[in-house]
Amino acid sequence: MSTTEVVRDAQSAENYNPLAKQKAAAKLSRIPVKVVQQGEVLKKPEWIRVKAGSPTTRFYEIKQILRESNLHTVCEEASCPNIGECFGNGTATFMIMGDKCTRRCPFCDVGHGRPDPLDKDEPLNLAKTIAKLRLKYVVITSVDRDDLRDGGSQHFVDCITNIRELSPMTQIEILVPDFRGRDDRALEILKAAPPDVMNHNLETAPRLYKEARPGSDYQFSLNLLKKFKALHPQVPTKSGIMVGLGETDEEILQVMRDMRAHDIDMLTIGQYLSPSGSHLPVRRYVHPDTFKMFEEEAYKMGFSHAAVGAMVRSSYHADQQAHAAGV
């Protein structure tokens, strides 16, 4: 595991350390559209409060095995509110290629910094860990690696190949970055070992991309999934959206229509929760009735499965989502 220094406070130019893992204000002080906090923080409504149960033996077992294997999970790095439930149930979303992202998205709690070199042992270590945990369904995601010529696609393939060698019955979902400028090369590489589910999150409405997803492009992300589907029509494609960043209901519905127009099969929609006072603020809490409306509209549009609700995250109950969609 990386022992890199973690910096949270904004740094001056002379004190800036690109090798450090930057979090919170340190990460977001250099984004093009600065985060503007609203006057009063919205109070969390009752329906989005996570019921924190006592950590189970399985929870501690997974954490110990992850540390012993030098592996990261997005559950921990992104401060997911569902970590207790998922770890307790023996599921985790593994984050490969390090814990420092080359992007600085102000909704995300994953650290930013100059990435470390790829760990050539990670694919086998990951496969051994999954076999040890006897997992039947795994999600593999990664930080953005704009420093790599293939965006990290070969590392995904190496992980998938190793997992299938040691756990041939385990189903694999990958949650990939956008492979900015390298999508055709990445898709060609992924042909060697396509996943059971291909996931890439659109995150929000296109109007909010400059603020929420600096360095990303809405149409580019849609095209990535459409291109993958054309190459692998038998593999379900999936994408997720957050609500609460300042979008309207109609904008969410339009994103859903755009997804279907680009052959995306599965959908997740969840409430955005701000990781810190330095991140984008929550601009609205969406009522359960509105989530229900989104879910009903999703099935009318033809999605094979839609997981919609305040605490839904892209990887939350991913196995149940996939099985409900026929995977």
From Swiss-Prot:
This protein's UniProt keywords: 4Fe-4S, Cytoplasm, Iron, Iron-sulfur, Metal-binding, S-adenosyl-L-methionine, Transferase
Start and end residues of each Radical SAM core domain: 87-304
InterPro entries named among the record's database cross-references: Aldolase_TIM (IPR013785), Elp3/MiaA/NifB-like_rSAM (IPR006638), LIAS_N (IPR031691), Lipoyl_synth (IPR003698), rSAM (IPR007197)
Key word 4Fe-4S present: yes
Catalysed reactions, semicolon-separated: [[Fe-S] cluster scaffold protein carrying a second [4Fe-4S](2+) cluster] + N(6)-octanoyl-L-lysyl-[protein] + 2 oxidized [2Fe-2S]-[ferredoxin] + 2 S-adenosyl-L-methionine + 4 H(+) = [[Fe-S] cluster scaffold protein] + N(6)-[(R)-dihydrolipoyl]-L-lysyl-[protein] + 4 Fe(3+) + 2 hydrogen sulfide + 2 5'-deoxyadenosine + 2 L-methionine + 2 reduced [2Fe-2S]-[ferredoxin]
Location of this chain's protein in the cell: Cytoplasm
Similarity-based family: Belongs to the radical SAM superfamily. Lipoyl synthase family.
Protein name per Swiss-Prot or TrEMBL: Lipoyl synthase
Species in which this protein is naturally found: Variovorax paradoxus (strain S110)
